[in-house]
């Protein structure tokens, strides 16, 4: 009897994994839309459909809470870098979290920026609830001329 139970459990594992896969795929799609529609295209309406009202955005030392302040942050970013563009290099999903590795490119005045980083998203009820950013701020500062380069 034990052997039959174990065999049945092992046989059902692929079904359980397959049932969980769509959640990860949907969450990855939300993260992709964040980069494409919000960051790359600057779509204000995409913010409403993808971001939770009580979103928390962390890019140390900056912490932004709430969708209104998040909108202001994005507007300032797009003003500083009008041609801002993110290219996704990798993405991983586990449960309600999505990790992305990206390259951010843009121009501020005459200075070009090409910086790599990673984001971790917490997605609940189909909306981004939290974003953690980790990026190469030294490279960004060097490229923008605020810190001497190597």
PLM region spans:
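Short beta-strand edge/turn micro-motifs at domain boundaries
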Residues: 120-144
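Bacterial N-terminal signal peptides
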Residues: 7-15
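Positively charged n-region of N-terminal signal peptides that target proteins for export
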Residues: 1-4
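A short hydrophobic beta-strand element
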Residues: 95-104
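Beta-strand elements of well-folded, non-transmembrane domains
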Residues: 106-108, 123
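Short, low-complexity N-terminal intrinsically disordered segments enriched in polar/charged residues
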Residues: 15-49, 53, 145-150
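A solvent-exposed, acidic/Ser-Thr-rich amphipathic alpha-helical stretch
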Residues: 25, 44-96
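Short, surface-exposed coil-to-beta transition loops
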Residues: 85-86, 113-118
